[in-house]
Amino acid sequence: MKTRTVLFSIAGTVLAFAALDAAVAFFATRDSLAGPLDLSNVSKIRVEGAASDIAISTASEGPHVAELKGERHGWGAVWHSGWYSDACPAQGSMRIEGDTLTVDVGRAARFFDWSDCTMELTASLRPEAAVIIDQQAARTRLAGDFSVVDIRSDAGDVSLRGHAQAISISGAALRAKVTFERVMQNETIAISGKMLEATLKFLTPTPVSYLVEAVASYVDSALPNTPGAKPEITIRGEMVHTRIE
């Protein structure tokens, strides 16, 4: 009987901790680390650091601003929000030099940190801005008209809807979805990754040229390959799945 009681007590404790852990998973605190900053005179954004969730848009009308936030999830968010004042992480920062906004999202969370921290960048700029991202991991959502989009990320999830004259996306494991709302016949698109899933969609029917180089590839194109035409698409990788429509 004593053995059974002990076993039930242990089982009850495990279930209680499991329930508490599940509840804490829904607990999050959000810290505003920097901004909003005025981007009226900014035409280029550069994002550095470990990892972040990025949303950048362009519009002729303002306000043109940027804000960096950190959102904590998990056990540490419960205690950290009430007892500590330092942000998530404290070294996340933004600075403007000339026409360039540089965003540093800081280091990745350590293995023994009590909470996971998601760095979130939101920005609105004037059309034809340039976006440069160099991170270990990034989820990037772009909407609007851009001059240059240059993204280097070991693990990346990229979506762009609008237009960009030059697109370069590279990394190890990538998923990219690019939707062109208009075409100027001067676009170049280069996407490369070891494991790559890429979808390119043109809302206006247009001739395109494309080159796919991969160890193993599956290319599904609704548009014929027209040598010399632009948009010019180059895709390289080891395992590649590409759709062009």
Feature names for model-found ranges:
Residues 137-139, 155, 173, 216, ...:
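Transmembrane beta-strands of outer-membrane beta-barrel pores
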Residues 140-142, 153, 158-160, 176-178, ...:
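Fold-core signature of tandem repeat domains
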Residues 2-134, 150, 161, 168, ...:
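Acidic (Asp/Glu) and glycine-rich low-complexity loops/linkers
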Residues 145-147:
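Charged, glycine-enriched surface loops/patches
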